[in-house]
Design a protein with these regions (language model features):
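N-terminal pre-domain/capping segments
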Residues: 1-101, 105, 167, 171, ...
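Active-site acidic/histidine proton-transfer and metal-coordination neighborhood
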Residues: 68-70, 81-174
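A structural motif corresponding to the C-terminal end of an alpha-helix
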Residues: 28, 65-73, 102-104, 131-138, ...
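Histidine-acidic metal/acid-base catalytic patches
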Residues: 1-7, 15, 19-26, 98, ...
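Catalytic-core regions built around general acid/base machinery
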Residues: 53-70, 95, 124-131, 158-161, ...
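Active-site-proximal loop/turn and secondary-structure-junction residues that shape catalytic pockets
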Residues: 11-15, 37-41, 78-82, 112-116, ...
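Short, solvent-exposed loop/turn segments at secondary-structure boundaries
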Residues: 46-48, 85-89, 119-122, 183-186, ...
């Protein structure tokens, strides 16, 4: 099977109707979609967003069947509170794994937390790794603005020492906007990527922009890349070097949502136009084989 890079979008707490972003993905033929359990409850009983308790078995089955019918790769983003270092973190992650299994998702994503160092994080995550593997799922660990390339190099070195981690079980979710905000690589997300050890497997992508001032989650090509897309081109080249195949999630719900279509279309153009020449003496590889022919 030819590996494909699937562009998709994500649920959004800003939507009054939680299914609106998914319906948008279906309508526009996206190849991936991420379910982010980001429910927030307010004083007075009102709430925004959703969590797994809002998705009964009937709805989960419908999501799974719809994804299969439309050839959409699902991923699940665990709640931001799902920190395995906290007492309630592992149960939240297990709940996300169960939801992911029920809808036929590929992986569950969570944030790296270095409060107890790489060994402490890996130890706390071990039961979730085992449970995910038994459920046929992978875990992706996402960089936050506070976590550095060195943190990921250390974390994956610790993971390699863990018997529970089989090949391909755990990888990194590279968040481009967070990499741009990280202090050691501020406003230089390409440097962030280049400082990741080759042994750190990138298996998932969150893509958004900022100006280095805040985690603003600007749609791709509406921030700095609107004027100069050299950084995006360099990012795509790094993906090619790593032989990346998987989802690329546009992690925002802009107004108008049409900006997502424009970003996906522009990415498609860059992937098609990228030079197929050699990189570091490597073989000649056509970019098109990395890209899902749909938007």
């Amino acid at each position: 099977m030819i590996p494909r890079l699937r562009i998709g979008n994500q649920t959004a707490i800003a939507c009054a109707e939680r299914m609106e972003p998914f319906e948008f993905a279906l309508r526009h033929g996206f190849g991936a979609f991420e379910w982010f359990a980001d429910k927030k409850e307010y004083p007075g009983g009102s709430a925004a967003g959703w969590d797994e308790s809002d998705m009964d078995q009937g709805l989960r089955a419908w999501i799974r069947d719809t994804g299969e019918a439309h050839d959409i790769r699902f991923t699940v983003h665990a709640p931001w509170q799902a920190n395995p270092l906290h007492p309630d973190g592992v149960p939240l992650l297990i709940r996300s794994v169960d939801f992911a299994r029920d809808i036929g998702a590929d992986l569950v994503n969570l944030h790296l937390n270095m409060a107890e160092g790489a060994p402490g994080f890996v130890r706390s995550l071990e039961p979730v790794i085992r449970y995910a593997a038994e459920s046929g799922l992978r875990l992706s660990i996402e960089n936050t603005p506070r976590t550095t390339p060195a943190d990921f190099n250390q974390t994956f070195a610790s993971l390699r020492e863990l018997d529970a981690v089989g090949p391909g079980t755990v990888g990194m979710c590279l968040d481009l906007g967070h990499a741009n905000l990280c202090t050691p690589t501020h406003n230089d997300f390409i440097r962030y990527i280049d400082e990741l050890a080759p042994e750190v497997p990138i298996i998932h992508l969150h893509v958004h922009e900022n100006y280095g001032d805040a985690d603003s989650h600007l749609t791709l090509f509406t921030g700095p890349a609107r004027i100069d897309d050299a950084g995006v081109r360099a990012f795509l080249e790094r993906l090619r070097r790593r032989d990346y195949h998987g989802a690329l999630i546009l992690e925002q719900w802009p107004r108008p949502p049409q900006l997502l279509i424009e970003a996906a279309t522009r990415l498609r153009e860059l992937l098609s136009l990228s030079s197929p020449g050699r990189v570091d003496g490597g073989p000649r590889i056509e970019w098109r084989r990395f890209f899902d022919a749909r938007v």
